Amino acid sequence: MNDSALTQIKDTTANPAPLGLLGFGLTTVLLNLHNAGFYELNAMILAMGICYGGIAQIIAGIMDCKKGNTFATTAFISYGFFWLSLVALIVLPKIIPAIAPANEISMAAYLAMWGLFTAVMFLGTFRLNRALQVVFGTLTVLFFLLAIGDATGAGAGFKHATGFEGLLCGFAAIYTGLAQVLNELAGKIVLPLGPVKK
């Protein structure tokens, strides 16, 4: 009788979530400083949207896919391509004159669909932690406020207020990402994430 050896494969890859959260968070803060009226839209925001908000999040999503994490895979890859699509919306009409720029109604529809997607993802965070609930909750509000602003042709005051709400969302994502890094390094809770009972 032959004894069959059982081989176990241990996953030693890093947790990609902090990369995704920080890519999202830093880019969101920088964009919403523009929305809040601190500076004009410029190449810095577009570069962050392509590189850290876009590519870095997509990489994090692919890494999470290998870990079998459906929620993180869906979130990071989706929002990574959101940033790339947002940059494309701004840049494409300038590169190809035949492409008409997005008007306020089409942008409202675009942002509302992302708000709907985020609202459903927000429900998933109730099985994760409070920090992610804040990130996805404030992001849901942000998308719908941006959509309302475009649909109604809201003035600068509304858009600036929306920008400050976006800053809250971005900083919440930065906190959540850095908390995961520091907690893992310390081997204990340094920055709480607010675990939920499952």
Question: Each predicted region: which residue ranges?
Answer:
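Alpha-helical membrane segments in multi-pass integral membrane proteins
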Residues: 109-120, 130-151, 158-179
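Cytoplasmic-side transmembrane-helix entry/capping segments in multi-pass membrane proteins
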Residues: 70-79, 132-138
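C-terminal ends of transmembrane helices
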Residues: 57-67, 119-127
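Structural signature of hydrophobic alpha-helical transmembrane segments
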Residues: 41-54, 100-113, 136, 163-167
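Juxtamembrane loop-transmembrane helix junctions in multi-pass integral membrane proteins
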Residues: 8-15, 37-44, 66-70, 98-105, ...
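Helix-adjacent hinge/juxtasegments
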Residues: 73, 81-109
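Short, highly charged, low-complexity non-transmembrane loops/tails of multi-pass membrane proteins
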Residues: 187-198
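N-terminal topogenic module of multi-pass integral membrane proteins
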Residues: 1-60, 64
